Amino acid sequence: MAEQLSPGKAVDQVCTFLFKKPGRKGAAGRRKRPACDPEPGESGSSSDEGCTVVRPEKKRVTHNPMIQKTRDSGKQKAAYGDLSSEEEEENEPESLGVVYKSTRSAKPVGPEDMGATAVYELDTEKERDAQAIFERSQKIQEELRGKEDDKIYRGINNYQKYMKPKDTSMGNASSGMVRKGPIRAPEHLRATVRWDYQPDICKDYKETGFCGFGDSCKFLHDRSDYKHGWQIERELDEGRYGVYEDENYEVGSDDEEIPFKCFICRQSFQNPVVTKCRHYFCESCALQHFRTTPRCYVCDQQTNGVFNPAKELIAKLEKHRATGEGGASDLPEDPDEDAIPIT
């Protein structure tokens, strides 16, 4: 190795080492080109002619019962193993189809009453329930009443009773619905009715404005008036539901509370006066009553001798006098009494 080799010998004796780079393994996502094999009589350089696509044949895999997959699950195979194409066609399931035959009737399917008379079959039979036992006992007691004991055992519920119970639930329970023990359930499922007689409004708060439960009260705290369901149904039947009447929302004025006769003399007003408690009298009647007592004739409050002219009443009386007959109908007077002018 220490000797120097000649150039001709060096070429023959030198060993060359070739290092091959590994190919990329991440090219799985690349799009593969179709394999084109040129025909032997044609050159591969011709771009005008098309290329032949070689498709690999699908291998037939032997069915393995230990391997399960969702693909091709619709095919039913009779046995494990290969099947011929004819056998596969025979074993393929036919397309499912549902065919209904018309009854040529417009009636709905099912019972004619749409199940309104359906019976709850989980309860005890009518011939064996507590109601039937009670009715049989009542019938036997009626037959044995007034007879001697015949020494016949009729069951634990049918012992002869020599005294008829009265004023008790058992004595008055001819139907058996008010006695103790189980009660027979309704026969039909649609027999349950709930009446709307519970407005769920706090009665204490509605009447007094105060409730001892406070915010924890489960009823509505409202002092308004509500209509029950039966009242709404009655208005619907009479055709009055939803009809708003203006007079229900009119606020009465103070003039409507003014009387048209004096409280003391029961006659039409002459020089009307009004007290502090808003009561109207004739001037002469008020002064005459004040000589007896300083209190009001109606409410017995202290007037202190203060009588003011009733200007509102005077204006109302003049208005009704001007209307003529309308005013006479609103202010009826005695037929034998003459009209007294207002000064």
UniProtKB/Swiss-Prot annotation:
GO terms for biological process: DNA repair; mRNA splicing, via spliceosome; negative regulation of chemokine-mediated signaling pathway; protein ubiquitination; snoRNA splicing. It catalyses: S-ubiquitinyl-[E2 ubiquitin-conjugating enzyme]-L-cysteine + [acceptor protein]-L-lysine = [E2 ubiquitin-conjugating enzyme]-L-cysteine + N(6)-ubiquitinyl-[acceptor protein]-L-lysine. Transmembrane segments: none annotated. GO terms for molecular function: ubiquitin protein ligase activity; zinc ion binding. The modification Phosphoserine is found at S6, S84, S85, S253. GO terms for cellular component: nuclear speck; nucleoplasm; nucleus; U2-type precatalytic spliceosome; U2-type spliceosomal complex. Required for pre-mRNA splicing as component of the spliceosome. As a component of the minor spliceosome, involved in the splicing of U12-type introns in pre-mRNAs. E3 ubiquitin-protein ligase that catalyzes the transfer of ubiquitin onto target proteins. Catalyzes polyubiquitination of SNRNP200/BRR2 with non-canonical 'Lys-63'-linked polyubiquitin chains. Plays a role in DNA repair via its role in the synthesis of 'Lys-63'-linked polyubiquitin chains that recruit ALKBH3 and the ASCC complex to sites of DNA damage by alkylating agents. It is linked to Trichothiodystrophy 5, non-photosensitive: An X-linked form of trichothiodystrophy, a disease characterized by sulfur-deficient brittle hair and multisystem variable abnormalities. The spectrum of clinical features varies from mild disease with only hair involvement to severe disease with cutaneous, neurologic and profound developmental defects. Ichthyosis, intellectual and developmental disabilities, decreased fertility, abnormal characteristics at birth, ocular abnormalities, short stature, and infections are common manifestations. This is E3 ubiquitin-protein ligase RNF113A.
